Amino acid sequence: MKKLFRSLAIVAMTVLTLTACTTKSEPSNEVNNFRIKRGTNLSHWLSQNNEDRGEARRLHIQEDDFARLDSLGFDFVRIPIDEVQFWDEEGNKLPEAWDLLTFALDQCGKYHLRAIVDLHIIRSHYFNAVNENDKAANTLFTSEEAQQDLIDMWYQLSDALKGYSNDSVAYEFMNEPVAEDHEQWNQLIAKVHKALREREPQRTLVIGSNLWQGYQTIKYLKIPEGDKNIVISFHYYNPMLLTHYGAWWTPLASYSGKINYPGVLVSKEDFDAAPDSIKKELEPYTTQEWNIDKIREDFKDAIAAAKQYNVQLFCGEWGVYEPVDRELAYKWTKDMLTVFDEFDIAWTTWCYDADFGFWDQKKHDFKDKPLVDLLMESKGLENK
């Protein structure tokens, strides 16, 4: 696919083959000190940003952002990155993005923040391709070439980032996998895990479940046994009608009726008044009770998996779209935080700024300070 990646792949596959014949790749038994609790995503900077380059991208996240997050009480950040920002179509590095990533990690170190480097979107896999009727774009799970490209990207990321302490930086080698079969994802996990462990036996690896890191598919997730430097990740935006109310990219974007939380979200009157075109998607919200007990129920498989493997559990994305009624948003957020604290689940909100965030980069001011105050009422690390 990409000339440079293809050359690297030939060398890498040869080395892996020889290694596999003579040694067994094993993670270190030593557990590092990558402890996390309260964080946020630095989204739409090195990922999902097709416009900002040069000075605009450089100025988007600066030192004062890391200082602010530290002073507010956050202890880590998740940094989504995209292949198109770090490599051109021939597989050549694009230096500016690499410099910005290391700048971010250096600032994290300066301001006592741990970091997860999240490979968010790659050319062979985009988590939303199915919803955008571009299913053919996802070749990762059917192409050995694409899988080797993914490993090659992580070889290069590892070369650049391995100098950062295992206690401070973790790798999330893919975001929101969407494989037709759960075993396709499990097999890719094993392959990438083996490749990374041969280079970095103690680095914390964040691994999520198939189908958008959904809580429903955690029970099918298989992670390498005996590796304690792994974090299990899931994402949670339920109920979507509440968290994404009015979001133009969702099936229920045209719903303008009232919503309620906790309880049944949509009344019979509001359902009857809704457009016929959305009633099929809307109907479940007229009977299902949404409350803190529903959140606990949804989390049970993720909690069980973390106990089974004896590893940390992490909700990597959760949040409420900016136009949603703030009182409803705060009620849901409070319930989420309560469950996180009950089961010692680390979290990163989606996100710091942008349309789910609490900070306005253009105005350089809070756009939702009460949300931040609520987030900081939850449990933090005892010794950050």
Features from the language model and the residues they span:
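Active-site region of glycoside hydrolase catalytic domains
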Residues: 36, 144-289, 296-321, 342-343
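Active-site mouth of glycoside hydrolases
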Residues: 30-204, 209-217, 229, 356, ...
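Bacterial Sec signal peptide processing site at the extreme N-terminus
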Residues: 22-32
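Aromatic-rich peripheral "rim/lid" segments of glycoside hydrolase catalytic domains that contact
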Residues: 324-384
